[in-house]
Swiss-Prot record:
GO terms for molecular function: RNA binding; structural molecule activity. The keyword Ion transport does not apply. Capsid protein. Probably binds RNA and plays a role in packaging. SUPFAM superfamilies: Positive stranded ssRNA viruses. This is Capsid protein. Disulfide bonds: none annotated. It comes from Cucumber mosaic virus (strain NT9). The N-terminal arginine-rich stretch does not seem to be the major RNA-binding region that allows formation of an infectious ribonucleoprotein complex. GO terms for cellular component: ribonucleoprotein complex; T=3 icosahedral viral capsid; viral nucleocapsid.
Length: 218
């Protein structure tokens, strides 16, 4: 065998291991794709079971944080004279307040205009002292200090203003369910008197999950 044949044989011998090595990444890629699909299905399953702080007639749905759910309360403001104010403390059901150490992450207010609504209202949520009587003067000062976000909701011909939600983040404050009695929803009727049949406020309190009863009520 001459020198050229020896060189050619040597090259062929060196190629064989490389042919075998090419199949390894292909197998690993297939396994990775299967694992990715399984994780994707798992994420979809977990997301589907997570509560959502939304309402079918409202836009901008928000999924609750993992491990959290929400409790909703409804507030219907009484008549508010033009340029006047209304305040209501957050009072959760007893079935929720008994777990007063569960953390609260966010408070969401959804403004639901009724058919007769034709006004402009300002809405906010504030932490208030236990001694506060939520008088007109006290509420007016809280709107003026700029310490909380304010939602300005105006009449819209479509019936629902594009932005009808206010989201108040309490995560950094480490607030819990027991603290909710220290918070109040405040309303300012700016341009017109707000009648009792014009507006409903839905307040969603996002909090850590609480045990549910396994016994039917008597």
């Amino acid at each position: 065998m001459d020198k050229s044949e020896s060189t050619s044989a040597g090259r062929n011998r060196r190629r064989r291991p490389r042919r075998g090595s090419r199949s390894a990444p292909s197998s690993a890629d297939a396994n990775f794709r299967v694992l990715s699909q399984q994780l994707s299905r798992l994420n979809k399953t977990l997301a589907a079971g997570r509560p959502t702080i939304n309402h079918p007639t409202f836009v901008g749905s928000e999924r609750c944080k993992p491990g959290y759910t929400f409790t909703s309360i409804t507030l219907k403001p009484p008549k508010i004279d033009r340029g006047s104010y209304y305040g209501k403390r957050l009072l959760l059901p007893d079935s929720v307040t008994e777990f007063d150490k569960k953390l609260v992450s966010r408070i969401q207010i959804r403004v639901n205009p009724l058919p007769k609504f034709d006004s402009t209202v300002w809405v906010t949520v504030r932490k208030v002292s236990a001694s506060s009587d939520l008088s007109v003067a006290a509420i007016s000062a809280m709107f003026a200090d700029g310490a909380s976000p304010v939602l300005v909701y105006q009449y819209a011909a479509s019936g629902v203003q594009a932005n009808n939600k206010l989201l108040y983040d309490l995560s950094a404050m480490r607030a819990d369910i027991g603290d909710m009695r220290k918070y109040a929803v405040l309303v300012y009727s700016k341009d017109d008197a707000l009648e009792t049949d014009e507006l409903v406020l839905h307040v969603d309190i996002e909090h850590q999950r609480i045990p549910t009863s396994g016994v039917l009520p008597v």
